[in-house]
Amino acid sequence: MRILAAGSLRQPFTLWQQALIQQYQLQVEIEFGPAGLLCQRIEQGEKVDLFASANDVHPRSLQARYPHIQLVPFATNRLCLITKKSVITHHDENWLTLLMSPHLRLGVSTPKADPCGDYTLALFSNIEKRHMGYGSKLKEKAMAIVGGPDSITIPTGRNTAEWLFEQNYADLFIGYASNHQSLRQHSDICVLDIPDEYNVRANYTLAAFTAEALRLVDSLLCLTCGQKYLRDCGFLPANHT
């Protein structure tokens, strides 16, 4: 079985893949990448059994083209602001003051190619509604440096934000809140929550192209086994409000 999955799913899906091989003797090949770029490959004719997207937009666009596929929401996520602890120089600094600092470089994912980039633009719009002029300044300031067809390639196994900071590409990065889990081991990294009134809900959705893939989803990923991997890696349930 062949699966294309959003890069943010690498940790839980790798655990799921290992369980499928060890417990069920199922051979599963998973390739990770920005969901928008993966969707383009499917639209161009690439064969796949299952597509796991970080949004519901790409699966719906595929269903419009291939009406037989089944869509299954399976997890949600939120955005957060990631930075180096050394960047926070004053106790009264919060996520918004850091974002608006003219001295700090803000890295983001590439919109359209990577859903995280689209969610980031939605975050900027939410900020603009509450602080006139802030959102437009952030759109000008943000550097789309990952997730695009010609973007920087993050080494496999490295956290995106941590690697960007290490290589001096950015001082701040807007990523998924599930990063909390993988960044705990980095004592020099700080993850700041974004309040609900500003934040954006990321709706992770599966597109099953074959009956076998749908059975696999129904029997494993969306029940206790697969959901435990998702929860352990910082994802929220599909019905989370």
From Swiss-Prot:
Signal peptide feature range: none
PANTHER family named among the record's database cross-references: MOLYBDATE-BINDING PERIPLASMIC PROTEIN, SULFATE-BINDING PROTEIN
Name of the protein this chain belongs to: Uncharacterized protein PM1146
Database matches in NCBIfam families: PRK03537.1-4
One Pfam family recorded for the sequence: SBP_bac_11
Recorded GO MF terms: molybdate ion binding
Superkingdom of the organism of origin: Bacteria
Transmembrane segments: none
Single GO BP term: molybdate ion transport
Annotated S-S bridges: none
InterPro entries: ModA/WtpA (IPR050682)
